[in-house]
């Protein structure tokens, strides 16, 4: 992997519940960068929660808003961005992420994701009779897309949030994005 701009943006991709927001926020704090979550940004811009947007506009309307937010945010510098789990479904989003920063895929198996998200009613795609099966289906479709745009993959299985943050920082150091991992 070639050395990159030391001020490069860092973008997190992965399925819902993988830890993109939690880990992303901690990485941003350690790098002294501004953190954004694309879903939170959509909610701030519309004044509506994600389930309401899905209900009113459908998934296609939500994805249009998501593409606009990703396009806008990836033009900034020195940011850390946690994307929504489905952001990679659109080729233009994958290209935008790949071309404007370092992409980190936080990978978790569907069973672990189900354990983390099973009580969360703010995830419209999981409001089904078989949310675990839904996560497995989403994983099958999205895993190759996450891998396509990722500069590296971090397995989220057992490590603590701090452990995951340190793994991300180590990869950023190896990629030439930071001089050395910063201490907590």
From Swiss-Prot:
Listed GO biological process terms: amino acid biosynthetic process; aromatic amino acid family biosynthetic process; chorismate biosynthetic process
Q: What class of enzyme is it?
A: transferase
- Annotated transmembrane regions: none
Q: Which cofactor does it need?
A: Mg(2+)
Its pathway, per UniProt, is: Metabolic intermediate biosynthesis; chorismate biosynthesis; chorismate from D-erythrose 4-phosphate and phosphoenolpyruvate: step 5/7
Q: Which reaction does it catalyse?
A: shikimate + ATP = 3-phosphoshikimate + ADP + H(+)
Q: Name one Pfam family in it.
A: SKI
Q: What is its main location?
A: cytoplasm
> Which positions bind Mg(2+)?
21
* Cofactor remark from the record: Binds 1 Mg(2+) ion per subunit.
Alphabetized UniProt keyword annotations: Amino-acid biosynthesis, Aromatic amino acid biosynthesis, ATP-binding, Cytoplasm, Kinase, Magnesium, Metal-binding, Nucleotide-binding, Transferase
List of residues binding ATP:
17-22, 123
Q: State a GO cellular component annotated for this protein.
A: cytosol
Binding-site residues for substrate, renumbered to this chain:
39, 63, 85, 142
GO MF term set: ATP binding; magnesium ion binding; shikimate kinase activity
Is tRNA processing found in the keyword set? no
Q: What does this protein do?
A: Catalyzes the specific phosphorylation of the 3-hydroxyl group of shikimic acid using ATP as a cosubstrate.
Q: Give the quaternary structure.
A: Monomer.
Protein family membership? Belongs to the shikimate kinase family.
> What's this protein's name?
Shikimate kinase
What taxonomic lineage is listed for the species of origin? Bacteria, Pseudomonadati, Pseudomonadota, Betaproteobacteria, Burkholderiales
């Amino acid at each position: 992997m070639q050395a990159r701009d030391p001020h490069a943006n860092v973008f997190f991709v992965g399925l819902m519940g993988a830890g993109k927001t939690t880990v992303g926020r901690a990485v941003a704090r350690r790098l002294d960068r501004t953190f954004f979550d694309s879903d939170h940004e959509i909610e701030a811009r519309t004044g509506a929660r994600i389930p309401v947007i899905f209900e009113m506009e459908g998934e296609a309307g939500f994805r249009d808003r998501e593409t606009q937010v990703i396009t806008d945010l990836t033009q900034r510098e020195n940011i850390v961005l946690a994307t929504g789990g489905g952001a990679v479904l659109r080729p233009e989003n994958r290209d935008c992420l790949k071309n404007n920063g370092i992409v980190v895929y936080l990978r978790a198996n569907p069973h672990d994701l189900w354990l983390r998200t099973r009580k969360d009613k703010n995830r419209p795609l999981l409001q089904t009779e078989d949310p675990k099966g839904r996560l497995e289906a989403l994983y099958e479709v999205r895993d190759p897309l996450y891998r396509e745009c990722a500069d590296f993959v971090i397995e989220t299985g057992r490590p603590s949030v701090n452990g995951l943050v340190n793994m991300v920082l180590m990869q950023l150091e190896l990629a030439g994005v930071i001089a050395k991992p910063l201490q907590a």
